């Protein structure tokens, strides 16, 4: 069972919040106190909440659920992509385009264009057009890949989103709320927990903390996928 320990979180600096003057009062239940003008997050609250979230991620993925990892801050971007790829799930790590979930029909058309352009790079189409046109299409492909590359194979809306930084990704959270998609999110002391179904109070800026969240989430998803494969094999054997 994928779990994290108090020591893991302390070592990663999960307990370091923001300066007290930037706090969101809605995070008061999760704050231990302040030290040198910086809020300290109560890890005795975070630990059970995080492990509960991990158990739910495992359950969702064991039912073939799709998890969308979201983290567009510079500190999180590469780690978000790596974690999603590691557990064969999906990600948005560059910029959240408004309507990515709520206007899925339009997004799907853009994904189709992305895949068409990918095909053109391989089937000789680029050899038959002018260099200028080929360059324009290459730039279009790069732009689409940056925005949609992490969801191009998602084939429909996700069953949950795992967010690094509730404050920074508030548009993604709002869209998920509108569609009834469960939201798992790291919520720092300067953020609101509103709209988050599985609140994980913690530092959303430190790279070590971000890596801890993502490693644990990816492990939970892989565990769920593994149990699903085992169940399918048992059913086949019968």
UniProtKB/Swiss-Prot annotation:
<dbReference type="GO" id="GO:0006412">
    <property type="term" value="P:translation"/>
</dbReference>
<dbReference type="InterPro" id="IPR005706">
    <property type="entry name" value="Ribosomal_uS2_bac/mit/plastid"/>
</dbReference>
<dbReference type="GO" id="GO:0003735">
    <property type="term" value="F:structural constituent of ribosome"/>
</dbReference>
<dbReference type="Pfam" id="PF00318">
    <property type="entry name" value="Ribosomal_S2"/>
</dbReference>
<dbReference type="GO" id="GO:0022627">
    <property type="term" value="C:cytosolic small ribosomal subunit"/>
</dbReference>
<comment type="similarity">
    <text>Belongs to the universal ribosomal protein uS2 family.</text>
</comment>
<protein>
    <recommendedName>
        <fullName>Small ribosomal subunit protein uS2</fullName>
    </recommendedName>
</protein>
<keyword id="KW-0687">Ribonucleoprotein</keyword>
<dbReference type="InterPro" id="IPR018130">
    <property type="entry name" value="Ribosomal_uS2_CS"/>
</dbReference>
<dbReference type="InterPro" id="IPR023591">
    <property type="entry name" value="Ribosomal_uS2_flav_dom_sf"/>
</dbReference>
<dbReference type="InterPro" id="IPR001865">
    <property type="entry name" value="Ribosomal_uS2"/>
</dbReference>
<keyword id="KW-0689">Ribosomal protein</keyword>
């Amino acid at each position: 069972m994928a779990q994290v320990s108090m020591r893991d979180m302390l070592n990663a600096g999960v307990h370091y919040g923001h300066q007290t003057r930037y706090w969101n009062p809605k995070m008061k239940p999760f704050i231990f106190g302040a030290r040198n003008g910086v809020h300290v997050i109560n890890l005795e609250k975070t630990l059970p909440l995080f492990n509960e979230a991990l158990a739910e991620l495992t359950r969702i993925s064991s039912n073939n659920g799709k998890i969308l990892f979201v983290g567009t801050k510079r500190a999180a971007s590469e780690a978000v992509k790596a974690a999603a790829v590691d557990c064969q799930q999906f990600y948005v790590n560059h910029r959240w385009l408004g309507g990515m979930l709520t206007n899925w029909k339009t997004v799907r058309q853009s994904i189709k264009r992305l895949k068409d352009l990918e095909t053109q790079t391989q089937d000789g189409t680029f050899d038959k057009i002018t260099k200028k046109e080929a360059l324009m299409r290459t730039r279009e492909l790069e732009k689409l890949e940056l925005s949609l590359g992490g969801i191009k194979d998602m084939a429909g809306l996700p069953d949950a989103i795992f967010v690094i930084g509730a404050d920074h990704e508030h548009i993604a959270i709002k869209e998920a709320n509108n569609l009834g998609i469960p939201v798992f999110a790291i919520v720092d002391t300067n953020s609101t927990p509103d709209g988050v179904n599985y609140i994980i109070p913690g530092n959303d800026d430190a790279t070590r903390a971000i890596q801890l969240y993502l490693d644990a989430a990816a492990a939970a998803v892989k565990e769920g996928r593994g149990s699903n494969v085992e169940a399918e094999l048992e059913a086949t054997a019968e």
